[in-house]
């Protein structure tokens, strides 16, 4: 529909930029490059799908790395990106969930929801243990320091370790999931969410 034209252009730019800038060999090798002690530690927390969760976290970081590059290098397309972010990340239902007591119990689903939307102006970095540390690890304000998909993977790996360190001793109910939700699987991630400070920021020029 015409009203979704800008969103469609923004999404096409996002996906095209992935093809140009992302190294998908990292994903092919991910089962070999995730250290065994990390997956073993996750199993002790009842998490059997740690590689899938790390892959989702990588996607979050990589999306923002890629989008930041395009946002800065092609200013004429910024409005298309903003339209895409408004549709996928500034939805009123997301705002409401972030401001409520939903996703405030330390679980994989809670962390993934809060991480995916961590750039939202309604983000509460105190909602989950370690969420502020995860935000700092991502370093959205200096995301352009990440020069490769492998750099993004290493950040995602550290984020995963922070999540694991804050989960209850046993979380068997999360072991059957894939660490993602509909928003994660269907939509791209914001490319510029902050300035490296403790306060979430929206994409700006």
Task: Give the label of every model feature segment.
Residues 1-205:
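Short, functionally important secondary-structure microenvironments
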């Amino acid at each position: 529909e015409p009203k979704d034209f800008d969103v469609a252009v923004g999404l096409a730019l996002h996906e095209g930029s992935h093809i140009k800038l992302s190294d998908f060999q990292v994903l092919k090798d991910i089962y070999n490059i995730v250290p065994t002690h990390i997956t073993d530690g996750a199993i002790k927390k009842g998490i059997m799908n740690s590689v899938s969760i790390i892959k989702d976290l990588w996607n979050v970081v990589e999306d923002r790395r890629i989008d930041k590059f395009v946002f800065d290098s092609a200013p004429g397309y910024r409005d298309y990106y903003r339209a895409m972010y408004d549709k996928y990340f500034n939805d009123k239902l997301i705002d409401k969930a972030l401001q409520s007591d939903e996703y405030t119990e330390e679980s994989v689903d809670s962390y993934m929801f809060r991480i995916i939307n961590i750039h939202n102006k309604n983000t509460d970095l105190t909602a989950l243990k370690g969420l502020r540390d995860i935000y700092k690890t991502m370093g959205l304000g200096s995301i352009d320091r990440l020069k490769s998909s492998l750099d993004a993977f290493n950040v995602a790996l550290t984020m995963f370790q922070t999540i694991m360190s804050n989960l209850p001793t046993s979380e068997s109910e999360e072991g059957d999931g894939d660490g993602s939700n509909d928003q994660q699987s269907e939509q791209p991630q914001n490319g510029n969410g902050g300035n490296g400070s403790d306060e979430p920021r929206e994409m700006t020029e």
